[in-house]
Amino acid sequence: FYFVWQLDFRSRKYPVESFMSPQVADWGKALLLFNNGFPINDYEDADWLAIHGANLFGNDKVSFSERVQWAWDNEDNIVKTAENPLDYTWWTEADKTWQFLGWCFEWYGLLREGWGYYTHLPCAADGSCNGLQHLSAILRDEVGGKATNLIAGDKPSDIYTDVAEKTKRLVEADAEQGHEIARKCLTFGIDRSITKRPVMIVPYSGTQHACREYIQEAIADKIEKKGLENPFGDDLFNVGLYLAGHVWQGINETISSARRVMDYVKVVGTHYADAVKHMEWVTPTNFLVVQPYVNTKKRLIKTHVDGNLVYLSYQQELPDTVNRSRISTGSSPNFIHSLDAAALTMTVNRCLDAKMMDFSMVHDSYGTHSPNMPIMSQLLREAFVDMYEKHDVLQDLRDHAEKVTGDSSIPQPPAKGNLDLQEVLKSEYFFA
């Protein structure tokens, strides 16, 4: 069967089906196979299937060659899992449990049948905090580009670990001054699990308040799931508040360009609000994005249902108004979402030109059959580079805003750095 897809107002793509699709939770994805199969004829064809399995298990911070070797080294575990998953539960240790179990069945099929085995399993390559990849590319930020794998390296860069290390150094400085919470934080440990979600929300107008909440949740999760001793007692709020300040500073040091892009998009949004116009822009795929944010007024309806008096309330949209607050909070994440949607569109078009017809797509995770993954990997890089070399998206945003609002006082975009986007074409771990 085929999935029916729809586009939202930013041109992001979503399957209409909500129960089982390439964009649902782990268990739903685990049920999906491509109708068409492709033969795995040699080790090169099998590489991406091996990489995909390592990624699903959680062994995704090492080089590709180490991930491939991991799959071959675990042949015994995989065979036992595929033959008797109810009794041999090694697979339950995987990060994405159900998809990994499905992968074990596929790898077992390859081991059993050998070269020529027809694979139907979607294999995925994920972006490195994809929103930050776009933000770094927009301003040609070398520091952010290195942290998000826009620049080639022997192993994948991990921005969450980078921010965790910066945070740890700041906390160590406080601990040396006798700061009690800092000392407890160092004893507990500051790693990527603490900083991952705060970093992930940055491209989407995440706040320091949200950062504190995510840090508290991460600490509580480590205590509960890993059985770590809790040195903080009932004081997680103040611990989260303390760490949030340092995590926020670490983020700003790592991806300063991201802040400048988001702040600039918000500035452009204020000019739309001043002109009482809905904010809009045109993406590199020529898709017109319009933010339909208007003010609302609460209305109360009094009616009778089955002899009982019932009050119903609803929000009535007020015509010829714009919601200044929603423009401010929504403009930056919507802008970035529209750009990752454009990159996905351009990638799929290139794949179709290359006669590839099977896709398993999320906005920051592109998938197809293992033998075709090298082709898709090259095409998605070409699409990304082409998009940002041919389109100055901030200048386009500004010029379109002046055209719509008639306001020539909109400031020019911030200056760019020296990142060479051609480096993306050589970066193995841009999508990995």
Sequence positions of predicted segments:
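Conserved catalytic core of nucleotide polymerization and phosphodiester-bond processing enzymes
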Residues: 1-432
